[in-house]
């Protein structure tokens, strides 16, 4: 069939078009061939018709017209091109043909010259056919040599293209690339290359063949991919080089460090070898031992103990330090001279001046104390030697010689006190007090050994009290037994020597009286009181340079603590306010007792305030007087204890400029006007609050009358300002106004603060010695859990000066301890000792049994609080004071106590508490404050359901127990829910079901109707005339408008109720009428349950209704 769209075609035979389907080898000649097609068709008509020969001739003529040779290798050169360049365009044209043959689908994108789209498609199809026809025979005729030549040409062309690509500066050739290398085509410009290319001539009327868009896109993508691969390869190469460089550097650094470490190790080894050669090398244990010894040495120095071997060294060091200080003083002066003196520098100068004065005062005090001690030692030795020479062996002679200076009887002495005091003063002038010799234990000499047998007698004379004359013969008899032979019958002759001996003892005791004088004062005991968190312990920490407060549980003091400050330390602290040194210290030191501030520890504050001679009441200047402050004021007023007020936390005043450990007046003068005004305002508020409590108060330096006005000392526990003023004021008041109460008494007074187990000493007791002297070997009696404890003192230990007695540390041993002092006593059998009890010393004439009874009376008063019924909780505490606080709390809560104990909790304590599981399970509880619970005891408690509550802070224990009691209450409430009957009165409206179950509509006339409320009706029996209570059962359902309800109250719309009853239920119409009023069936048990568990829920109107219903149901 002839192709469509061809005009002027006379021969429609399809065979005539066979020649046209064969495309020329050169695609560039396609356009001229297409243009000459009509002319060729006209000549065809004139040619003879001859079948195959005519067809061959026709093809040959066409080739001639196009200027093509029969040989495709030689005839591919287009017209107008040089024949020499024939092979190259021939190859490139062939290559272009091969590229286009693969992509048939892109042909529709090409644009035709003229005509519609269909005509264009037909022409393209014809061209494809021609190409197929031409290529097949041409490819078959290639010889081997031609193929080799073609291959070489292609290789040559490929090399040229690569060389052109490398030349980035020059333009690329416009030759068409092979399909295997589409990316190269993109870079070729349209300009002709030096080599001839098969480009069509514009005169021929044809157009240049374009590369399809999708091929260009693929080429671009391939080029981009190649570029990325190259970049990735370059980046990987750079990364590899960088890693190699880093590894090389790391290796160099490692080697350098190893070399440095080896060098350092070698250097240290050489240093150790050098020290070993010099004999100076110390191991770790030796260094620790040296540091420990140094600390002990410092503590001994702080206590005022001098070591002769170190005195010369200290002098040299002191001289060197003095020179160094002078140089240091000169340096800052030179720097300061040219500068302007501003406020900050004034503060620095004041602080430096205060420090220098304190150091100078401390050195002077130490030197003075040393000279006094040497002088006292020399005098003591001389007196001992004189005393030994003049010792009278005959007691009668001694008694006769002393009789001249003393009154005849104790009664006469008591009646004439003034005369007695004069005699004492005369005796004091004649001979110094022997007590002074007991301040420091001296090394034993031969003379001292001779005087030792007199010690028991001296002790006996100190402890002995004046007694009525009735007991004198008995005591004389008791004391005379070893000296004389006793007869079964008494006679006047026998009584004479006894009376004489009693007289001797009285006279022997008499010379010891001069000890009580104003120059021989004991250390005053000062108690710190105040509200919680006012800074009591922090104030002490600042004075003694410790950190006790932060180590306490919750930062709260819960036990009495004691700290001893020697006079040297007080002098050093007060040097800032005693610059001229005129103030003289007569007391040997100051013992400060720290008491808890919490509400529960009123008993400990009471015990602390009873021990003390003077008190410090700490008040927060920002808050004024608080509840426990007012309670402390009441305690002080009751005991008539003098006190000073520390207005603490002045550093919290806005804008306060601090100077560490300075006097208040100097610091206050440097503050600006606003701070001074604020201080004055707060001071006036505190004064007003004290006036409300009945106390006149004034600033300490403005106070002219200490008897009538309380002194207020502003202090800061953080900066230490005002503390020197406070210490000086306390010592001043003690020496001037309280000398009589600070004189030594022969009677020993001591209180046990705490019982502790100390490694190396066993169980020990902390004791506040407020009067008398304790010695090693003394027989003591104190209160124990299983009765009085009688034992001998094995060791007397005191903490280092200015260290808390409660805190573990290095202890100093003493042969004897003089009041007032906090002392730790080590003795056998102290395991059951009770903290807070009294400690008594058994004298030669004292009866141990009497002392036992006296000591045990403390514990009896405590056990009197224990419930006699045997039902109650068990309480275990660490000290007597804590136990008292717990018992007070439980008494306020109305909780009975069955057992009390002091110390750790063991299995026997838990077993004792387990008895409550049978008697009262709610009280099978142990409250343990600040004690350890044994592992076995805890296990036994868990197995048997006994609750053990432990806490280090007393309020946490209270909270735990309160929570437990609340849980028990809720449990009981749930159990007794069915017994609780809320009162209500119901008026029936309609009966829906008469029985089993009764369903009735009711109005609530009074009270409230709840589910499970028992309902009853009260009727009068017509025959007997008595009340009959008809029980209907319990309300199991309440509905209104078919909606269930839990409760229906008075005044709400009517509801339908269902009443069910197990067994036979009364029926409406037979036992009941619709008009009968219904009531909630109350009883005595239900009323008790309401009172116990629902008292806060039941309203006053409901209680009134219960009273009415009691008469209805005859409840008593």
UniProtKB/Swiss-Prot annotation:
Q: Which residues are recorded as binding K(+)?
A: 533, 555
Question: What ranges does the record give for the region G4, renumbered to this chain?
Answer: 648-651
Comp. bias (Pro residues): 192-201
Region named G1: 530-537
Q: Which residues bind Mg(2+)?
A: 537, 557
Keyword annotations for this protein, in alphabetical order, are: Coiled coil, Cytoplasm, GTP-binding, Hydrolase, Initiation factor, Magnesium, Metal-binding, Nucleotide-binding, Protein biosynthesis
Decide whether keyword DNA repair is in the record.
no
**Where do the segments described as Disordered lie?**
1-513
Start and end of every tr-type G domain?
521-742
Renumbered to this chain, the Basic residues biased-composition regions fall at 57-66, 327-338
**Annotated Pfam families:** GTP_EFTU, GTP_EFTU_D4, IF-2
Q: What cofactor does this one take?
A: Na(+); K(+)
Residue segments, region G5: 716-718
| UniProt-recorded name of the protein | Eukaryotic translation initiation factor 5B
The species this protein belongs to is: Chaetomium thermophilum (strain DSM 1495 / CBS 144.50 / IMI 039719)
